[in-house]
């Protein structure tokens, strides 16, 4: 799709470094989100009347790393603007930028094999990339409008509306993109909402506080209220997004015929778990939440359990002989049928690219099997050079026939 001539080795290094950066930044962002929500929920009225008179709205005592901490939160601002002032924003920005870079390296550069599955939707690489980017932008715009309209009247209705966005995105992505990419698309859309919350709402609200203090005026209350609302939303979205990040390793979810419904169920469960801890922070222990969470996960696991192992049998017909028969045997023993569709091998996997639709050349199959690509592992060392040649020859000769 994109005019980049990258070797598989170079792509692997880009994948490694960008993925590493993405995980590091994500940990920092999630950690700060969890910490500040917990801190806000643990604040209590100041014990000293002097503190209340200075505009302090809450305080908390903490112990960590061998020492005590006394945290004070002002209702509006301190008497004097402190310097330096620590901001929490680059964790979010770096997470999104590295995540989008990863989306480009793994899915947009290789859209024809990783983003598109023509057995799902007959899209060109360019169309798939444009739709993907459009969903990222459109998802944020719709969410932001809902927050500024419905969210001003009812948090419950807003929560239902946000769930509706997630359901629509999950279903739509499952009908447009390759199964594995569909989950990442939904996670990327939610992650874009979270990062945009920080960039367009939360940080501008903080700047309003700073400017108001410098100008000696009362800050506008609405930006602060919106910032708090979006911060809470980000907190609840963290675990659903983390699931989409790790989902590529579990084809039992995105490879299912009802993959979109599984995604919605597990994202709701993730947000439900987050709700348990947020309640704990205010002294409410709702043990029925982990009980219903365990029951929900068990129900999903039972409902999606395959009736039998993926078929790797041979389509009835004239039996293959010689190298073709050997290649078909390697295709079966290496587990290729669990991820790929190849009619002549009786393979109906929906996880990886549909080989009948892609019709890969022998050279391409050799490269992918030897070096891997994206989340497809390398089989170098697991298969002998002869076996790799045999399976490459077999796939290239029967794909699409």
Give the ranges of each region predicted by the language model:
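Polytopic transmembrane helical bundles with strong interfacial aromatic enrichment
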Residues: 1-314
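Electrostatic cytochrome c docking/interface patches
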Residues: 7-11, 310-332, 351, 364, ...
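Short, thiol/selenol-centered motifs that function as redox-active sites or metal-ligating centers
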Residues: 34, 49, 336-342
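Gly/Gly-Pro-rich "capping" loops immediately C-terminal to redox-active cysteine motifs
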Residues: 328-332, 338-383
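C-terminal capping alpha-helices of c-type cytochrome domains
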Residues: 369, 382-401
């Amino acid at each position: 799709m994109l005019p980049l001539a990258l070797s598989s080795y170079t792509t692997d290094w880009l994948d490694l470094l960008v993925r590493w950066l993405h995980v590091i930044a994500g940990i920092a962002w999630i950690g700060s989100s969890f910490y500040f929500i917990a801190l806000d929920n643990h604040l209590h009225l100041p014990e000293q009347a002097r503190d209340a008179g200075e505009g302090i709205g809450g305080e908390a005592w903490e112990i960590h790393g061998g020492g005590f901490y006394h945290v004070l939160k002002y209702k509006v601002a301190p008497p004097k603007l402190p310097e330096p002032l620590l901001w929490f924003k680059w964790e979010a920005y770096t997470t999104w930028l590295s995540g989008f870079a990863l989306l480009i390296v793994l899915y947009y550069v290789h859209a024809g094999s990783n983003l598109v599955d023509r057995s799902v939707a007959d899209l060109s690489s360019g169309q798939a990339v444009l739709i993907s980017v459009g969903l990222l932008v459109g998802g944020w715009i719709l969410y932001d409008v809902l927050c500024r309209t419905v969210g001003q009247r009812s948090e419950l209705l807003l929560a239902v509306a946000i769930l509706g966005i997630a359901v629509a995105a999950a279903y739509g992505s499952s009908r447009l993109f390759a199964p594995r990419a569909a989950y990442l698309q939904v996670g990327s859309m939610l992650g874009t909402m979270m990062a945009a919350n920080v960039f367009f709402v939360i940080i501008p609200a903080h700047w309003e506080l700073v400017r108001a203090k410098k100008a000696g005026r009362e800050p506008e209350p609405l930006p602060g209220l919106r910032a708090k609302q979006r911060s809470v939303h980000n907190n609840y979205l963290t675990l659903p997004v983390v699931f989409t990040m790790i989902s590529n390793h579990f084809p039992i979810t995105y490879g299912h015929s009802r993959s979109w419904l599984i995604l919605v169920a597990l994202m709701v469960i993730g947000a439900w778990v987050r709700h348990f801890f947020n309640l704990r922070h205010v002294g409410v222990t709702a043990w029925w939440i982990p009980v219903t969470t365990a029951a929900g996960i068990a129900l999903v696991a039972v409902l999606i359990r395959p009736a039998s192992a993926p078929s790797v049998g041979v389509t009835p017909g004239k039996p293959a002989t010689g190298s073709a028969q050997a290649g078909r045997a390697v295709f079966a023993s290496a587990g290729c049928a669990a991820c790929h569709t190849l009619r002549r091998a009786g393979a109906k996997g929906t996880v990886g690219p549909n080989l009948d639709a892609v019709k890969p050349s022998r050279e391409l199959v050799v490269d992918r099997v030897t070096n891997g690509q994206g989340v497809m592992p390398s089989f170098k060392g697991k298969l002998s050079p002869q076996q790799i040649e045999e399976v490459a020859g077999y796939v290239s000769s029967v794909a699409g026939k």
